[in-house]
Design a protein with these regions (language model features):
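Active-site-proximal loop->helix
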Residues: 35-53
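Glycine-rich anion-binding loops and their surrounding alpha/beta cores
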Residues: 7, 11, 26, 48-55, ...
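Short, surface-exposed recognition loops or helix-turn segments adjacent to catalytic cores
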Residues: 32-35, 57-65
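Active-site cofactor/substrate anionic-group-binding motifs, chiefly glycine-
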Residues: 1-33
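Short linear Ser/Thr-Pro motifs
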Residues: 13-15, 39, 43, 240
Length: 261
């Protein structure tokens, strides 16, 4: 569950929140990510702010995954080339080919993917690459308003891989049970701000951050076959936000990741 980044909107870390919600249902999530390049807070930045140890030795990540249903695979620990270009990427502060490569280079050898792309033109080539790499189920998404995730303010273009076949669909937000909001209402801030707001979502606070987390979580749960429809996925996602399941998953990840330090 990851986005390419580079959409220019600097939203909250939606894929990170989504990963925690999905994992709370027992679905194993190997979250692959890096530090911020063009945004104010990358997935590793906000996870660090939340108290999670992102520098788990690669050989211990599987143990974390088995104990908590989620692990964070910090890209520089697995891909030496990413480490060498990190400084340059941080200096130029714009999207590069690594925004596209990163989401497709998950070292966990995962077979199911929900990936957001910053450009609609990337959906077809990226999902074809995933297909050639042996992925079983995958959704590539890009919203009409430019987000690298499913939007709650406009329709979203979806390329779906299943059973070796790729289908193209459009997800119409007005046909789904979510509260629409403007992009300006899901913009994030620095790592501290994002961590605070993400925690509020996991505590059950009802706001636009919750809505976009819920719809993306619903998509992930549907993509991997845990539920049959986006509507069912929404019910499950909101349930784990309301009953504390997603928050407990975060707490478990904090405890286990630091235990494995």
């Amino acid at each position: 569950i990851v986005g390419t980044g580079g959409d220019g909107y600097k939203t909250l870390n939606i894929s990170t929140a989504t990963s925690l919600v999905v994992a709370s249902h027992g679905v194993k999530v190997a979250k692959h990510g890096n530090r911020s390049v063009s945004s104010l807070s990358g997935s590793s930045d906000v996870l660090t702010e939340l108290g999670i140890n992102i520098n788990i030795a690669p050989e211990l990540c599987e143990e974390c995954l088995n104990e908590t249903n989620i692990c964070f695979l910090f890209a520089p620990l697995f891909h030496g080339s990413f480490k060498h270009v990190a400084k340059v990427r941080a200096e130029i502060k714009t999207r590069t080919i690594f925004n596209i490569l990163g989401p497709m280079c998950n070292p966990g050898n995962v077979k199911n993917h929900l990936i957001g792309a910053y450009d609609k033109l990337l959906l077809h080539p990226m999902i074809e690459v995933l297909k050639s790499l042996g992925s079983e189920q995958a959704w590539l998404v890009h919203s009409n308003d430019g987000l690298d995730e499913i939007s709650i303010s406009d329709k979203t273009f979806v390329h779906k891989l299943s059973n070796g076949q790729v289908l193209e669909e459009i997800l119409e937000i007005d046909k789904i049970d979510v509260e629409p909001s403007k992009i300006s209402e899901i913009v994030g801030g620095d790592a501290r701000y994002n961590a605070k707001e993400l925690f509020k979502v996991l505590e059950g606070e009802k706001n636009p951050y919750r809505e976009i987390t819920a719809i993306n979580s619903a998509a992930a749960l549907t993509m991997c076959g845990f539920c049959d429809s986006i509507e069912d996925g929404l019910l499950l996602s909101k349930e784990s936000l309301d009953n504390g399941g997603a928050l407990q998953t975060l707490k478990n990840l904090i405890n286990v990741s630091n235990k494995l330090a």
